Amino acid sequence: MPRVKRGVTAKARHKKILKLAKGYRGRRKNVYRIAKQAVMKAGQYAYRDRRQRKRQFRTLWIARINAAARELGMTYSTFMNGIRKAGISLDRKILADLAVFDKVAFEKITNQVKAGLAN
């Protein structure tokens, strides 16, 4: 069995990592050992932040709904309780969008919620 020289595969492996490290600063972009660590850490951050993004958006939506509801004389918790009692099936993303971009529609929903809470 002939001896296998690893030059081609090593070059390909290095090239793949250095391509992923493109745009990094300093030696992270052109020294294989450092670039490999940087790419691995970037992957860890990406994995973590894909999960955190969902939490952060939910927090943002809640803050927006709360601010808009308070302008109309309600707190977030009473507003969401009223949404459920009124049978309105809009999620937080849509409610936050309405609160920011269509205040008239959000006000109509709030009036329905107040009517639902009164019953």
From Swiss-Prot:
GO MF, one example: structural constituent of ribosome
Keyword list, A-Z: Ribonucleoprotein, Ribosomal protein, RNA-binding, rRNA-binding
Keyword RNA-binding in record: yes
InterPro entries (alphabetical): Ribosomal_bL20 (IPR005813), RIBOSOMAL_L20_CS (IPR049946), Ribosomal_protein_bL20_C (IPR035566)
Xref: Pfam families: Ribosomal_L20
PROSITE patterns for the chain: RIBOSOMAL_L20 (PS00937)
Gene3D superfamilies reported for this sequence: 6.10.160.10, Ribosomal protein L20 (1.10.1900.20)
GO biological process terms, semicolon-separated: ribosomal large subunit assembly; translation
GO cellular component, one term: ribosome
Family recorded in the similarity comment: Belongs to the bacterial ribosomal protein bL20 family.
Protein name as annotated: Large ribosomal subunit protein bL20
Organism: Nitrosomonas europaea (strain ATCC 19718 / CIP 103999 / KCTC 2705 / NBRC 14298)
